[in-house]
């Protein structure tokens, strides 16, 4: 069975049952890999950074000064490895999103193109997390260790991170999570319905093309809202902040569309609320 099938917006007869089973299995495996890696990435960015910090530093340790750290060979090696890992992730994530590369991947894998992208992203994130080099003895940009902030600030950061992750998951669900993870493409293909994006309006398709990272502000809060900021976390935060700023490409038309949709949702909610209140009043009378 070959997955070398081009995705079109036209309705067509679906593939054979064995082909659908194989495609579905591969798509689900890629989804599981992506979902599991995403859950581990939450732990990597939040849990360790708040309650144990990403560098694993211990209370009472005296970190190096910046001048000492720059001359420290171990510190230089750790920072060099971390920067290399970040460049590797960005290279994979950006290269596979390039139009020419996407066309080649689509030519080879067909409807599994998005699933393969998710799998490769998961693998690059796993490499980043597995080989990340902490700098527990490096100079901290800030480190809250005095009472009462040493007790309250981690809790406050935990609250900010929890709300941010909940918002991220909510936005991903709103932005068609199944299509984003490559499952919907296989489902539609097996039903002979073509590309899921072809069934959406041009304005929605345009918005999706510009907003594959609909989590900009929330991720910035997660990256920077930590009780202490060691050098490795600082590099991680700066790198992802710059990358997210470059790929965040909403324009005036996208904002206008989002505003119109929010106004429609609010109007619909207001009508439903008024109808419910009116029905309750009539029932009481």
From Swiss-Prot:
UniProt protein name: Nurim
Membrane topology listed for this record: Multi-pass membrane protein
Subcellular location: Nucleus inner membrane
Topology feature Perinuclear space, residues: 45-74, 131-149, 227-232
Keyword Transmembrane helix: yes
Transferase as UniProt keyword: no
Membrane side Nuclear: residue ranges: 1-16, 97-113, 181-207, 251-285
Family per similarity comment: Belongs to the nurim family.
GO CC, alphabetical: nuclear envelope; nuclear inner membrane; nuclear membrane
Bilayer-spanning residue ranges: 17-44, 75-96, 114-130, 150-180, 208-226, 233-250
Organism: Xenopus laevis
Keyword vocabulary terms for this entry: Membrane, Nucleus, Transmembrane, Transmembrane helix
């Amino acid at each position: 069975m070959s997955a070398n099938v081009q995705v079109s917006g036209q309705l067509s007869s679906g593939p054979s049952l064995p082909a659908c089973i194989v495609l579905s299995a591969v798509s689900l495996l890629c989804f599981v890999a992506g979902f599991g890696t995403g859950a581990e990435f939450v732990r990597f960015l939040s849990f360790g950074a708040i309650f144990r910090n990403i560098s694993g530093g211990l209370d009472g340790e005296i970190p190096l000064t910046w001048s000492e750290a720059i001359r420290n060979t171990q510190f230089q090696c750790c920072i060099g490895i971390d920067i290399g890992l970040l460049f590797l992730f960005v290279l994979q994530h950006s290269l596979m999103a390039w139009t020419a590369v996407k066309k080649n991947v689509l030519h080879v894998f067909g409807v599994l193109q998005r699933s393969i992208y998710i799998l490769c992203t998961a693998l690059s994130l796993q490499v980043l997390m597995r080989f990340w080099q902490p700098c527990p003895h490096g100079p901290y940009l800030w480190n809250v260790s005095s009472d009462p902030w040493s007790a309250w600030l981690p809790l406050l950061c935990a609250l900010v991170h929890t709300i941010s992750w909940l918002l991220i998951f909510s936005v991903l669900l709103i932005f068609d999570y199944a299509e984003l993870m490559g499952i919907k493409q296989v489902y539609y293909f097996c039903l002979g319905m073509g590309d899921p994006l072809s069934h959406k309006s041009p304005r929605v398709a345009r918005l999706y093309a510009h907003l594959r990272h609909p989590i900009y502000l929330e991720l910035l809060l997660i990256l920077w809202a930590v009780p202490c900021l060691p050098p490795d976390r600082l590099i991680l935060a700066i790198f992802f902040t710059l990358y997210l700023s470059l790929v965040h490409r909403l324009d005036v038309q996208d904002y206008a569309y989002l505003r119109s949709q929010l106004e429609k949702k609010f109007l619909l909610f207001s009508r439903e609320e008024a109808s419910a209140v009116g029905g309750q009043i009539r029932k009481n009378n």
